[in-house]
């Protein structure tokens, strides 16, 4: 197979033009190309208004020597490649006396369970929230002014917090073992868009993702796994430092010697109970901030130029800054054509997040602009002190908005005045009840100052970013877990048989990296144990 890199065509080109360009590079006719598979597609907008798409493509040929073709091309961007598909490890020999238990159905838990089910381990998946259909109803009720369900919301339920997000799938994690591409392939097998396999910044969208996780659940069941909703794990039962069972909130016990702890970063009650039970944890760096909304067209023109082609869709952005005081300020979970959503999971507290549908066709762009947090900000290096800091900020947000999402013009946030007025031509795109309020009162002064300094720097890179009519809302407090559950080289915690996993445990940041960690933990279990057999108990 021949791989061509840096294949450059103007945005809006046809499939035929892509074939012709590849053939020209190889000095052959396009009819001699048997197959062409896009491996990567990215946008080059450095020379606006001229916008280009940059490709990496894999090609097979009809009746021509690939090696001779590569040699004749005399092009450093043309090479012979051999596909190395992902390989799940051979099973171990140790007998499983009980079925493995997966705690949490976010990306980490779901993919861990999926891989184990595919390979004969018959896992039991426990999710404290509801299935995705019932969960969506609870979330819509809450957004429309109904009561918060602490067990079924944007944070808890089938698919985890990522179900109500933009569904971004890009990751910076090196993927020499092929886990990342395998994760994307599983998404596609279960209904995601095939384009996510090659787009430089792939995303699914909340509307598609909810169907994908449902299909994955159904396949797990077909493969001999079991999925139980509204099943919150309270703590572990142990003997001589090893796991013997998981104890649920209703007092029931599931006997097992293997449990994957993939509870997500919002299961604060579980963190505290497991810490009290002796599970080793440590504080981890994190960041907090606010959601910032702009007209999507402002971002489109900044990124793609005034006369940008519609085929490019809604433009994303990524910005970072370092303040004069040394703090990092950066965008997080940018949602083109998206919505700010009420992502609260605890009564008396407000947390926000961003969400986009697959079409990304909303009028506004939003992103969290977040500021790095240190131990000095919350005055303790205790493992769970970061959670308490997050809670205090969420309580301030709840108070500022009288139970609704507090919203403010950036011009008022960055000044001492509060007009409580947003121009009619720019309306916030928010899922959930919101109100004009003093958002600046939510953040500590040191973080507000860093936020403003970062916004000013971003305004130099994206004209209008720090415009007074941009809208801020808060608080974005759950960008990542403030806790890491310590695990060893076998991926187990100090309680043998417990496998901390995913973003909540401190080993991932986003859907794809969490799913990859779930696959990695499944590999660790499979490398040790033989597939589950009732007769082998």
What are these regions (language model features)?
Residues 1-53, 57-537:
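Residues forming the flavin
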């Amino acid at each position: 197979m021949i791989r061509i890199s840096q294949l450059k065509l103007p945005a809006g080109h046809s499939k035929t033009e892509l074939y012709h360009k590849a053939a020209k590079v190889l000095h052959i006719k396009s009819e001699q190309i048997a197959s062409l598979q896009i491996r990567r597609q990215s946008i080059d907008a450095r020379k606006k208004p001229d916008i280009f798409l940059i490709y990496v493509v894999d090609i097979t040929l009809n009746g021509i020597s690939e090696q001779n073709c590569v040699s004749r091309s005399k092009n450093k961007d043309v090479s012979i490649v051999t596909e190395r598909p992902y390989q799940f490890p051979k099973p171990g020999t140790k007998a499983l006396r009980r079925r493995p238990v997966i705690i949490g159905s976010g990306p980490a838990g779901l993919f861990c369970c999926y891989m184990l089910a595919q390979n004969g381990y018959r896992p039991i998946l426990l999710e404290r929230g509801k299935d995705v259909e019932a969960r969506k109803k609870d979330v819509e009720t809450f957004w429309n002014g109904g009561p918060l369900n602490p067990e079924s919301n944007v944070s808890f339920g089938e698919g985890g917090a990522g179900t109500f997000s933009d569904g971004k799938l890009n990751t910076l994690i090196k993927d020499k073992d092929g886990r990342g591409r395998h994760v994307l392939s599983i998404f596609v097998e279960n209904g995601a868009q095939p384009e996510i396999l090659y787009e430089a910044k792939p995303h699914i969208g909340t509307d598609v993702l909810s169907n994908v996780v449902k299909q994955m659940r159904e396949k797990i069941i077909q493969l001999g796994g079991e999925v139980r909703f509204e099943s919150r794990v309270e703590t572990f039962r142990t003997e001589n430092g090893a796991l013997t069972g998981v104890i649920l909130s209703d007092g029931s016990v599931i006997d097992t010697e293997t449990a994957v702890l993939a509870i997500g970063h919002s299961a604060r009650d579980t963190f505290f109970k497991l810490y009290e039970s002796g599970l080793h944890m440590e504080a981890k760096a994190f960041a907090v901030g606010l959601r910032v909304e702009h007209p999507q067209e402002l971002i489109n023109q900044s990124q793609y130029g005034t006369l940008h082609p519609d085929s490019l869709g809604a433009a994303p952005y990524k910005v970072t800054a370092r303040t004069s005081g040394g703090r990092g300020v950066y965008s997080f979970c940018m949602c083109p054509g998206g919505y700010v959503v009420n992502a609260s999971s605890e009564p008396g507290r407000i947390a926000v997040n961003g969400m986009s549908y697959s079409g990304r066709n909303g009028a506004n762009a939003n992103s969290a602009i977040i500021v790095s947090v240190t131990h000095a900000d919350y005055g303790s290096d205790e493992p769970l002190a970061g959670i308490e800091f997050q809670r205090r900020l969420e309580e301030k947000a709840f108070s500022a908005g009288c139970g609704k999402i507090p919203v403010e013009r950036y011009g008022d946030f960055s000044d001492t005045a509060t007009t409580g007025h947003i121009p009619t031509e720019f309306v916030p795109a928010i899922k959930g009840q919101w109100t004009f309020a003093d958002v600046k009162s939510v953040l500590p002064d040191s973080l507000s100052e860093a936020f403003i300094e970062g916004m000013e720097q971003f305004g130099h890179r994206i004209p209008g970013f720090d415009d007074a009519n941009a809208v801020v809302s808060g608080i974005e407090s759950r960008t990542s877990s403030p806790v890491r559950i310590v695990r060893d080289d076998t991926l187990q915690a100090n309680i043998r048989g417990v496998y901390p996993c995913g973003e909540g445990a401190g080993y991932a940041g986003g859907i794809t990296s969490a799913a990859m960690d779930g696959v990695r933990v499944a590999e660790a279990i499979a490398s040790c144990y033989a597939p589950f057999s009732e007769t082998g108990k």
